[in-house]
Protein backbone atom coordinates (compact mmCIF):
# COMPACT_ATOMS: atom_id res chain seq x y z
CA UNK A 1 0.00 0.00 0.00
CA UNK A 2 3.03 2.25 0.30
CA UNK A 3 3.95 2.23 -3.40
CA UNK A 4 6.65 4.65 -4.48
CA UNK A 5 8.15 4.95 -1.00
CA UNK A 6 11.73 6.23 -1.21
CA UNK A 7 13.94 5.58 1.80
CA UNK A 8 16.13 8.41 3.03
CA UNK A 9 19.81 7.48 3.37
CA UNK A 10 19.73 7.32 7.20
CA UNK A 11 16.62 5.12 7.11
CA UNK A 12 18.31 2.81 4.63
CA UNK A 13 21.43 2.59 6.81
CA UNK A 14 19.30 1.78 9.89
CA UNK A 15 17.45 -0.97 8.03
CA UNK A 16 20.67 -2.36 6.55
CA UNK A 17 22.27 -2.41 10.01
CA UNK A 18 19.22 -4.29 11.34
CA UNK A 19 19.53 -6.86 8.53
CA UNK A 20 23.18 -7.46 9.33
CA UNK A 21 22.54 -7.61 13.09
CA UNK A 22 19.63 -10.04 12.87
CA UNK A 23 21.48 -12.24 10.38
CA UNK A 24 24.44 -12.61 12.77
CA UNK A 25 22.19 -12.89 15.85
CA UNK A 26 20.09 -15.74 14.47
CA UNK A 27 22.95 -17.49 12.62
CA UNK A 28 25.30 -17.83 15.59
CA UNK A 29 24.83 -15.50 18.56
CA UNK A 30 27.87 -16.86 20.42
CA UNK A 31 30.27 -16.15 17.54
CA UNK A 32 28.61 -12.77 17.00
CA UNK A 33 29.20 -11.91 20.66
CA UNK A 34 32.84 -13.02 20.44
CA UNK A 35 33.39 -10.87 17.33
CA UNK A 36 31.82 -7.82 19.00
CA UNK A 37 34.06 -8.23 22.05
CA UNK A 38 37.14 -8.62 19.83
CA UNK A 39 36.22 -5.31 18.18
CA UNK A 40 35.75 -3.70 21.62
CA UNK A 41 39.22 -4.81 22.73
CA UNK A 42 40.76 -3.45 19.52
CA UNK A 43 38.90 -0.14 19.92
CA UNK A 44 40.13 0.13 23.52
CA UNK A 45 43.74 -0.53 22.47
CA UNK A 46 43.61 1.90 19.53
CA UNK A 47 42.05 4.65 21.66
CA UNK A 48 44.57 4.12 24.48
CA UNK A 49 41.74 3.18 26.82
CA UNK A 50 39.43 6.10 25.99
CA UNK A 51 36.91 3.68 24.49
CA UNK A 52 36.24 1.26 27.32
CA UNK A 53 32.80 -0.33 27.31
CA UNK A 54 31.55 -3.36 29.20
CA UNK A 55 31.92 -6.58 27.18
CA UNK A 56 28.86 -7.93 25.40
CA UNK A 57 27.17 -11.09 26.64
CA UNK A 58 25.09 -13.35 24.44
CA UNK A 59 22.02 -13.03 26.66
CA UNK A 60 22.03 -9.24 26.22
CA UNK A 61 22.17 -9.25 22.41
CA UNK A 62 18.37 -9.44 22.18
CA UNK A 63 17.98 -5.65 22.27
CA UNK A 64 18.56 -3.18 19.46
CA UNK A 65 17.90 0.56 19.78
CA UNK A 66 17.78 3.42 17.29
CA UNK A 67 17.79 7.10 18.18
CA UNK A 68 15.84 9.05 15.57
CA UNK A 69 14.99 12.72 15.38
CA UNK A 70 11.37 13.86 15.33
CA UNK A 71 9.97 13.53 11.82
CA UNK A 72 12.67 11.09 10.68
CA UNK A 73 10.25 8.24 10.05
CA UNK A 74 10.98 6.18 13.16
CA UNK A 75 7.47 4.70 13.15
CA UNK A 76 7.97 3.39 9.62
CA UNK A 77 11.41 2.02 10.53
CA UNK A 78 9.88 0.32 13.58
CA UNK A 79 7.27 -1.38 11.42
CA UNK A 80 9.94 -2.51 8.96
CA UNK A 81 11.83 -3.95 11.95
CA UNK A 82 8.82 -6.20 12.59
CA UNK A 83 9.05 -7.61 9.06
CA UNK A 84 12.83 -7.93 9.26
CA UNK A 85 12.71 -9.76 12.59
CA UNK A 86 9.98 -12.14 11.45
CA UNK A 87 11.94 -12.95 8.28
CA UNK A 88 15.11 -13.92 10.17
CA UNK A 89 13.18 -15.60 12.98
CA UNK A 90 11.26 -17.85 10.55
CA UNK A 91 14.47 -18.70 8.71
CA UNK A 92 16.19 -19.65 11.99
CA UNK A 93 13.16 -21.65 13.13
CA UNK A 94 13.58 -23.97 10.14
CA UNK A 95 16.92 -24.99 11.64
CA UNK A 96 15.92 -24.85 15.32
CA UNK A 97 12.25 -25.71 15.79
CA UNK A 98 12.46 -24.89 19.52
CA UNK A 99 12.63 -21.16 18.78
CA UNK A 100 9.39 -19.41 19.65
CA UNK A 101 7.91 -15.96 19.92
CA UNK A 102 4.67 -15.54 21.82
CA UNK A 103 3.44 -12.15 20.58
CA UNK A 104 4.57 -9.12 18.63
CA UNK A 105 3.83 -6.13 20.86
CA UNK A 106 4.12 -2.42 20.07
CA UNK A 107 4.26 -0.37 23.27
CA UNK A 108 3.05 3.16 22.65
CA UNK A 109 3.30 6.02 25.17
CA UNK A 110 -0.40 6.94 25.07
CA UNK A 111 -3.73 6.13 23.45
CA UNK A 112 -3.30 8.67 20.65
CA UNK A 113 0.03 7.20 19.61
CA UNK A 114 -1.47 3.70 19.85
CA UNK A 115 -4.10 4.68 17.27
CA UNK A 116 -1.42 6.25 15.06
CA UNK A 117 0.60 3.02 15.16
CA UNK A 118 -2.51 1.02 14.28
CA UNK A 119 -3.20 3.27 11.25
CA UNK A 120 0.44 3.11 10.11
CA UNK A 121 0.55 -0.68 10.49
CA UNK A 122 -2.57 -0.93 8.31
CA UNK A 123 -0.86 1.22 5.65
CA UNK A 124 2.07 -1.21 5.75
CA UNK A 125 -0.30 -4.21 5.39
CA UNK A 126 0.77 -5.59 8.77
CA UNK A 127 -2.19 -7.20 10.61
CA UNK A 128 -2.60 -5.47 13.96
CA UNK A 129 -5.13 -4.92 16.71
CA UNK A 130 -5.42 -2.61 19.68
CA UNK A 131 -5.12 -4.54 22.92
CA UNK A 132 -8.43 -4.59 24.75
CA UNK A 133 -8.57 -6.43 28.02
CA UNK A 134 -12.09 -7.76 27.38
CA UNK A 135 -11.19 -9.20 23.96
CA UNK A 136 -7.76 -10.62 24.69
CA UNK A 137 -4.93 -10.72 22.17
CA UNK A 138 -6.32 -9.78 18.79
CA UNK A 139 -8.42 -11.52 16.16
CA UNK A 140 -5.62 -13.67 14.80
CA UNK A 141 -2.88 -15.39 16.77
CA UNK A 142 -0.17 -13.57 14.80
CA UNK A 143 -1.69 -10.07 14.88
CA UNK A 144 0.62 -7.34 16.15
CA UNK A 145 -0.74 -6.14 19.49
CA UNK A 146 -0.62 -2.37 20.05
CA UNK A 147 -0.91 -1.32 23.68
CA UNK A 148 -0.75 1.97 25.54
CA UNK A 149 2.04 1.67 28.13
CA UNK A 150 -0.23 3.24 30.71
CA UNK A 151 -2.47 0.15 30.54
CA UNK A 152 0.35 -2.09 31.77
CA UNK A 153 0.63 -2.44 35.52
CA UNK A 154 2.09 -4.84 38.05
CA UNK A 155 -1.39 -6.15 38.79
CA UNK A 156 -4.32 -6.02 36.39
CA UNK A 157 -7.34 -3.95 37.40
CA UNK A 158 -10.51 -2.91 35.56
CA UNK A 159 -8.76 -0.86 32.84
CA UNK A 160 -5.24 -2.26 33.13
CA UNK A 161 -3.52 -5.58 32.53
CA UNK A 162 -0.68 -7.23 34.43
CA UNK A 163 2.61 -7.04 32.54
CA UNK A 164 3.24 -10.69 33.45
CA UNK A 165 0.12 -11.86 31.60
CA UNK A 166 1.99 -11.41 28.29
CA UNK A 167 4.75 -13.93 29.14
CA UNK A 168 8.42 -13.14 28.41
CA UNK A 169 9.20 -14.43 24.93
CA UNK A 170 7.76 -11.58 22.88
CA UNK A 171 9.05 -9.33 20.14
CA UNK A 172 8.59 -5.93 21.77
CA UNK A 173 8.88 -2.62 19.94
CA UNK A 174 8.93 0.41 22.22
CA UNK A 175 8.09 3.89 21.00
CA UNK A 176 10.16 5.83 23.51
CA UNK A 177 10.03 9.04 21.51
CA UNK A 178 7.19 10.37 23.63
CA UNK A 179 7.77 8.36 26.78
CA UNK A 180 4.59 8.30 28.78
CA UNK A 181 5.79 6.60 31.95
CA UNK A 182 7.96 8.19 34.59
CA UNK A 183 11.30 6.87 35.75
CA UNK A 184 12.42 3.48 34.58
CA UNK A 185 9.01 1.79 34.59
CA UNK A 186 8.96 1.57 30.76
CA UNK A 187 12.43 -0.01 30.86
CA UNK A 188 11.33 -2.63 33.39
CA UNK A 189 8.21 -3.51 31.35
CA UNK A 190 10.18 -3.80 28.12
CA UNK A 191 12.80 -5.98 29.79
CA UNK A 192 10.25 -8.34 31.30
CA UNK A 193 8.15 -8.63 28.15
CA UNK A 194 11.17 -9.43 25.97
CA UNK A 195 13.42 -11.27 28.42
CA UNK A 196 13.30 -14.45 26.35
CA UNK A 197 12.40 -12.69 23.10
CA UNK A 198 13.72 -9.55 21.41
CA UNK A 199 13.25 -5.79 21.80
CA UNK A 200 13.62 -2.81 19.49
Where does each model-flagged region fall?
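Conserved helicase ATPase motor motifs in RecA-like P-loop NTPase domains
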Residues: 66-72, 176-180, 194-200
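Conserved pre-motif I regulatory segment
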Residues: 1-67
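Post-Walker A helix-loop "phosphate-sensing" segment adjacent to the P-loop in P-loop NTPases
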Residues: 85-94
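Active-site signature of alpha/beta-hydrolase-fold catalytic machinery across serine-
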Residues: 16, 80, 84
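Short glycine-/polar-rich loops that comprise or flank the Walker A/P-loop
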Residues: 101-102, 167-169, 196-200
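Conserved RecA-like ASCE ATPase "motif II neighborhood" in helicase/translocase motors
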Residues: 131-135, 140-194
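Conserved Walker A/P-loop ATP-binding site and its immediately adjacent core
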Residues: 76-80, 93-123
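Subunit-assembly interface segments of extracellular/virion macromolecular structures
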Residues: 31, 71, 107-113, 170, ...
